[in-house]
Amino acid sequence: TSYSAKECLEQLTDNGIFTPLQTQEDEFRKDNGFQKPYSTVQGEIGLFLTDAFNCIWKIADAYRKKELPLEKALSDKVLKAILHYGNIELGRPNDGPRFHASCFAIPTAAVNIYYAYLAQMEGAEIGQGRALLRGVCDMLKALGLQAWTQPLRHDETDENVVSISRFRNHVWWVGGNALAYRSLLPVAAMYRSIPMIDLLAEVCQRGISMTSQNTYSEAFWTEGFTADGAGWGHGKQCLIWGYPIDGTSNALSILNLLKGTPWSKALNRDNAEAILNFLRGGSWYYYKGYRLPCLDRGSYVYNPMEQSIPYAKMLDNIVTNWIDSFTPEEQKELQQLQVEVKKNRINMNNYVLGVYNGTRWFFNNDDLIKKTSDYHITVNMASVRCDGLESAVNMADEYNFYPTDGLTLFQ
């Protein structure tokens, strides 16, 4: 939110309602709008509730930073706001989509509010404090749990969300949608749940793997790094950037946090090979500071200035925190790649043709690429085996150029 913590406090009525959101709430209540299962209205409600919880989070964070005294930051009207907007969120129907706000934004705000008031929340958990505070503690934990429960899959995993099958074979629960945008580890810690952290550590390690046309049904995830060095997102969509990187990058970040704990895991050989294979293969889809078209949710994005290859930050994490998981020769390769990535010129000329330069066919996406220091040619072949690109409303192209129907790009 653009409002300051002080402004957010001033906007709260004694009943815990933000005055800038009052008119919108009244409109939703007309004709029982909060219970309508339609995606359009539920999407609007999700944004409305996200605004409310982000304002509460701003107040809580100001207390954490010692910018607000406790008597203001945890006043009755703040507690009532958590309960008011929380009850709206928990009362929404599950027969319509409950994505983005319900599984990403609101649980993230809730768990951060909980930790901002950690001392008070821990007291409430053992029965201390006012009934209003104890109710707020329960509400924040219920909202945070939605990172693990929403959206419903309408299968057996809804009865046991702490299961490996919960995080497989569904676009909402694999790759970036599984690990990058959900506050899974903070919520697991909030619940002090050993089974949750056990599961999360396993999902992170098994998710750093490869899929392919031939192993689609058996692979741990149905998207991410492909066996030829490219990537998929949302099933077989040829999204080299975005989802494949988000899933693995955040798996590595979570495993970073688990180092030095009973859940600490070393990368195994399969993990290392999957990472190195993608770093090599992904470099073919980037040339002298520019991403190629038709590889992300924005089909034809043009950047007038050079940019780093999208996996640059993930590579930095690997070199800094996971270099020991690779052989001495691979370590030298990763360090050289890191140097060249920072220059936006990935040549790696001391490696044989076909690794970073030359001609290469990416069979999972049906891409034929010729890459030299002088020119770059991509033949994106007509392919019934791929699904094109994401065209989601408000967050992608909203249309599709059908980039798997065959085109040739010369750079």
What function would you assign to each model-found segment?
Residues 3, 9-298:
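Aromatic-lined, polymer-binding surfaces characteristic
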